[in-house]
UniProtKB/Swiss-Prot annotation:
Catalytic function, reaction form: adenosine(2503) in 23S rRNA + 2 reduced [2Fe-2S]-[ferredoxin] + 2 S-adenosyl-L-methionine = 2-methyladenosine(2503) in 23S rRNA + 5'-deoxyadenosine + L-methionine + 2 oxidized [2Fe-2S]-[ferredoxin] + S-adenosyl-L-homocysteine; adenosine(37) in tRNA + 2 reduced [2Fe-2S]-[ferredoxin] + 2 S-adenosyl-L-methionine = 2-methyladenosine(37) in tRNA + 5'-deoxyadenosine + L-methionine + 2 oxidized [2Fe-2S]-[ferredoxin] + S-adenosyl-L-homocysteine
Residues engaged in binding [4Fe-4S] cluster: C112, C116, C119
Similarity comment: Belongs to the radical SAM superfamily. RlmN family.
Name the record gives this protein: Probable dual-specificity RNA methyltransferase RlmN
Compartment annotation: Cytoplasm
HAMAP family linked to this entry: RNA_methyltr_RlmN
Active site positions, chain numbering: E92 (proton acceptor), C330 (s-methylcysteine intermediate)
């Protein structure tokens, strides 16, 4: 009989577990500490629980931590890990080390419904949403976990399309009984879904990054079908109702395509669209994917685009590209094993 995973449980849920097993009330906090702070590899290591209570716990539960089943290493130090989340489902997480920080790009779904033209994950179609356990396992089972400084929800899937489980995972990441991370260390990236965006802003203090890619609705809808359901102009109007001037950061992601969205008219329209918002723009280099007739703009074009926006008061950066040689860069998260499973 399958056992229930403890990883991904809130303190309230752990209190229900200990109550049902006849354990003392304080045992829930002890279990949470072992799970999220002390990084145990088995229930037997929870030594401040009595042997009897450990045996009771083991009878119905396990840690719910599963090591990656495969990995690929880039020449730039980036590592892509493959996690098996069920018999036929796989997701990837990408570890990105830098001089003074180490970031993990985490997945929220197997595949994605959004079908953005430039994204390999969307070409897979949608298979399943991850549980909080499966989201947090990408962190808990990471070999470099102790080096992590930041987490970005920018992997496979649309986080706002799996908001209950994503919010639960973020709560555990930031709760004092959980990992105890500052929300400033976590960024969620989204195409922007009407039903989820407002709830995320109001229930989480983590940074928010919106996939923009064109300031013109008709063109954005060609690149990102989600535009047809919730336009970027409506989204900006909603975002203006919230204060992003303090510790929380609002960013807009902008992949620069050669001859598509890289001219001065686009920069001017971006300034017009985002006027009045306390935000920044991250320019991203496009990496070619099979069957997509888009090409990345050159660095000179991207630099000019950045300088124009910044000189007109919109702080803009060019994001460093990492892991291209192992298909780990933005829009390239697509697993051969998942595609193989979908065919079977």
């Amino acid at each position: 009989m399958p056992k229930y995973p403890l990883l991904g449980m809130t303190l309230t849920e752990l209190q229900s577990v200990t109550k049902d097993l006849g354990m003392p009330a304080f045992a829930a906090k002890q279990i949470a500490s072992w799970l999220y702070d002390k990084k145990v590899t088995s229930i037997d290591e929870m030594t401040n629980l009595s042997l009897k209570h450990r045996e009771l716990l083991k009878g119905e539960y396990d840690l719910g931590i599963s090591a990656p089943v495969d990995e690929m290493r880039s020449v730039d130090g980036t590592v892509k890990y493959l996690y098996q989340v069920s018999d036929n489902h796989f997701v990837e997480a990408v570890y990105i080390p830098d001089e003074d920080r180490a970031t993990l790009c985490v997945s929220s779904q197997v595949g994605c419904k959004m079908n953005c033209k430039f994204c390999m994950t969307g070409k897979q179609g949608f298979t399943a949403s991850l549980t909080a356990n499966q989201i947090l396992n990408q962190i808990a089972a990471l070999p470099e976990r102790d080096k992590l400084t930041n987490v970005v929800m920018m992997g496979m899937g649309e986080p706002l399309d799996n908001l209950d489980e994503v919010l639960k995972a973020l709560h555990i990441l930031t709760a004092s009984y959980g990992y105890g991370w500052s929300p400033k260390r976590i960024t969620l990236s989204s195409v922007g879904l009407r039903k989820g965006l407002q709830r995320f802003i109001e229930e989480s203090e983590c940074h928010l990054a919106i996939s923009l890619h064109s300031p013109f609705p008709s063109q954005r809808s060609e690149l990102m079908p989600a535009e047809r359901a919730f336009s970027i102009k409506e989204m900006v109007d909603l975002l203006k109702n919230y204060d992003f001037s303090k510790q929380r950061r609002l960013s807009f992601e902008y992949i620069v395509f050669k001859g598509v969205n890289d001219s001065l008219i686009y920069a001017k329209e971006l300034l017009k669209l985002l006027r009045g918002l306390d935000c920044r723009v991250n320019l991203i280099r496009f990496h070619a994917i099979p069957g997509v007739d888009l090409e990345g703009a050159g660095m000179e074009t991207m630099t000019s685009f950045r300088d124009y926006l910044t000189s007109h008061g919109l702080f803009t950066t060019i994001r460093a590209s990492r892991g291209e040689d192992i298909f780990a860069a933005c829009g390239m998260l697509s697993t051969a094993k998942q595609e193989e499973s979908n065919k079977n």
